[in-house]
Amino acid sequence: MRFLFLLFIVFPAIEIGIFLFLGNLIGILPTVLFMILTGIIGAAAAKKQGTEVYYKVQRDLQYGKMPGEAIADGLCIFIGGLLLMLPGFLSDLAGACLLIPFTRGWCKPILFKWLRGMSKNKRIIIK
């Protein structure tokens, strides 16, 4: 319940505050253009990296390897691309962290921990 409160009340309020602060600091037009630009860059980066991960999954499957790492990368890239396309600066920062391979390495253990927790609650099954 606390997570939903943060997601739907606190997070948008912080995003609006940052938007208003930057609008006053650099102007409304540059702020809006920056948000549009990050959305376009996010979509392009997610498409490029997503295609690379798709081919890596296929290659791993051809060699009989489990593509777990590539699938985790693909999930991070998908979520990162979505976050970059959403308007807001915190969501852009989180999306960029998921798209940059160096910082994605920090996020994947959190993703695996969350997935393992869901599998223990019988919400998903990991084989």
From Swiss-Prot:
Which superkingdom is the protein from?
Answer: Bacteria
Give the matching InterPro entries: FxsA
Gene Ontology CC terms: plasma membrane
Entry keywords, A to Z: Cell membrane, Membrane, Transmembrane, Transmembrane helix
Where in or outside the cell is it found? Cell membrane
Question: What membrane topology is given?
Answer: Multi-pass membrane protein
Major location category of this protein:
membrane
Segments spanning the bilayer are 3-22, 26-46, 70-90, 93-115
UniProt lists the family membership as follows: Belongs to the UPF0716 (FxsA) family.
The protein in question is named: UPF0716 protein YtzA
Species name:
Bacillus subtilis (strain 168)
For this protein's source organism, the top of the classification is: Bacteria, Bacillati, Bacillota, Bacilli, Bacillales
